[in-house]
């Protein structure tokens, strides 16, 4: 989209590097070298009044003094110099600046709100402080101090941690996985996660997004940007700092269950480990989408398949039986021993032909949303030939193919062949199932986004005068909380019916609690779950963000202990959840 605020960071025609020098260990010098090694085609301008050259290029004392026009600047100089450098950028007409100073908190203290406002008035946006920088492989732009170059691809990586970015980039290089862009936001004194996500959403090179979050600094912007991005392409979020500790960023944290509820309302899905984020990245990079949660498994090993089945049950992934046509093809081509249902067991002595027959039959079955091919390195199995067969089957197949090749040295050439062909491959059964689960949950969340809660009382608006009178009367009495009767009057003034709530008797009723709690980050959150006596042993509390309707409430209940309790329980009939 022309004119987006990320253009200066992703499409610069020229880059200035402040602080660049040829001194050994120079932070800015490493950034300049990365830009040169990556083959950046535009002008590179080292800015350093104390050096004549850097990286074989002439240094200028300042951009204003040089009169050169620059789109993007990288500020990798000492923290005490940052205010002057930001003002030099603003005066020279720079549109984007990465504050990559390695001075940590000192840099954050120097880049004050007043300095940010001054830069913004000049049309300059700041990324950082503490930002690793920006990588745009298709433009040969590596404006970071990270070693190595990144392959171009369709996956965006957006992170609050530069260290995690470098970790993921190193992991991706081993698997020949490319990126559309890599951007570390740092301390977000100006450009924040939400604004970055809005830019990523409309980036034509990006088909999937990996997002690492430690704390949400501007909740409204974050949720808005995340919702826009997740509406257009899958977004998988990994959040650290779920529990307080010495490394937890300062400021309000908010409850992790509320963060989960917020993600569900944006359409994004959540990973809980770096391994899961890697797995999601492998699948998102293919651009595959799924229509549901129906998975077929083809395997030559019973034990690992049982692990995959356990994880599928935990994630709500279904394994429906094969169709009659698929069953006929399997019966004709496979030995009678082993399962011809789902999972399909080709047996441990299966060669490439038998294995490929089963995988191909499942890929053609319209009853599946994806096929997982699992392979253990048993004696007769030639892994590389198996990988070549899988690559041929995946090419042009109507259904996504995932591979799980278990083992080490014997399997490595097969893994490399699959990576070159763009077939997502996973080291363990659980990760393969989890990767598919991310796409299945993404589809579910997108469907839930279409649910728009309707008015509680059609045809009538709120009685604001009555509500105001209730509140003013209570305040006049010196009350800090509304008693039951005024509280009911207040709710009824807004069209919320209040029914009597007798204690369930006779063993047939269920008691639930509903509470609205203000989260310090995301605001009002609805907590609900089991009420009454704790004898059930179920203490689960579910959380959702308003507004809600019946469909969204039922979606929050799915798979929960509360849902199980509302079904037939200890002789009591199923609760009337439709009410």
Language-model-detected regions and their locations in the chain:
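Catalytic-core regions of core metabolic enzymes
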Residues: 1-579
């Amino acid at each position: 989209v022309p004119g987006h605020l990320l253009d200066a960071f992703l499409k610069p025609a020229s880059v200035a590097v402040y602080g660049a020098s040829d001194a050994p260990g120079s932070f800015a010098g490493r950034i300049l070298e990365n830009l040169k090694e990556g083959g950046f085609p535009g002008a590179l301008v080292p800015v350093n009044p104390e050096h004549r050259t850097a990286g074989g290029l002439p240094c200028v004392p300042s951009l204003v003094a040089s009169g050169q026009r620059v789109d993007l600047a990288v500020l990798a100089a000492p923290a005490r110099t940052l205010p002057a450098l930001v003002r030099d950028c603003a005066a020279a007409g720079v549109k984007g600046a990465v504050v990559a100073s390695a001075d940590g908190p000192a840099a954050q203290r120097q880049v004050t709100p007043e300095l940010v406002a001054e830069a913004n008035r000049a049309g300059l946006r700041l990324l950082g402080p503490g930002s690793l920088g920006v990588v745009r492989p298709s433009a040969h732009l590596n404006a970071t101090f990270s070693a190595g170059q990144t392959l171009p691809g369709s996956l965006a990586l957006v992170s609050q941690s530069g260290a995690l970015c470098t970790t993921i980039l190193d992991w991706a290089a081993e698997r020949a996985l490319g990126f559309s862009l890599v951007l570390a936001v740092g301390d977000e004194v100006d450009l924040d996660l939400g604004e970055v996500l809005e830019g990523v959403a409309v980036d034509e090179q990006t088909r999937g997004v990996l997002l690492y979050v430690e704390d949400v600094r501007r909740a409204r912007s974050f949720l808005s940007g995340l919702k826009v991005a997740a509406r257009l392409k899958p977004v998988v979020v990994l959040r650290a700092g779920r529990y307080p500790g010495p490394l937890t960023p300062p400021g309000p944290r908010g409850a992790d269950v509320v963060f989960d509820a917020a993600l569900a309302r944006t359409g994004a899905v959540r990973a809980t480990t770096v391994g899961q984020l890697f797995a999601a990245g492998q699948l998102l990079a293919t651009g595959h989408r799924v229509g549901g949660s129906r998975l077929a498994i083809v395997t030559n090993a019973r034990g690992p398949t049982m692990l995959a089945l356990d994880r599928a049950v935990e994630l709500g992934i279904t394994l429906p039986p094969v169709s009659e046509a698929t069953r006929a093809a399997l019966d004709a081509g496979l030995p009678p021993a082993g399962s011809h249902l789902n999972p399909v067991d080709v047996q441990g002595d299966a060669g490439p032909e038998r294995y490929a027959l089963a995988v191909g039959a499942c890929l053609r079955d319209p009853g599946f949303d994806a096929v997982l091919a699992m392979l253990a390195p048993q004696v007769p199995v030639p892994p590389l030939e198996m990988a070549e067969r899988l690559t041929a089957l995946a090419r042009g197949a109507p259904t996504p193919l995932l591979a799980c090749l278990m083992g080490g040295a014997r399997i490595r050439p097969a893994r490399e062949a699959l990576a070159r062909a763009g077939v997502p491959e996973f080291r363990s059964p659980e990760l393969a199932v989890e990767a598919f689960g991310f796409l299945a949950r993404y589809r579910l969340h997108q469907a839930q986004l279409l649910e728009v809660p309707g008015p509680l009382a059609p045809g009538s608006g709120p009685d604001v005068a009555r509500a105001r009178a209730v509140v003013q009367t209570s305040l006049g009495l010196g009350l800090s909380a509304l008693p039951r009767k005024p509280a009911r009057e207040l709710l009824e003034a807004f069209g919320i019916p209040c029914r009597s709530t007798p204690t369930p008797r006779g063993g047939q009723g269920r008691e639930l609690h509903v509470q609205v709690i203000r989260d310090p980050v995301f605001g009002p959150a609805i907590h609900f779950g089991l009420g009454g006596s704790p004898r059930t042993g179920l203490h689960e509390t579910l959380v959702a963000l308003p507004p809600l309707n019946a469909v969204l409430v039922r979606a929050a209940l799915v798979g929960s202990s509360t849902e199980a309790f509302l079904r037939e329980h200890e002789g009591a009939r199923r609760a009337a959840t439709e009410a």
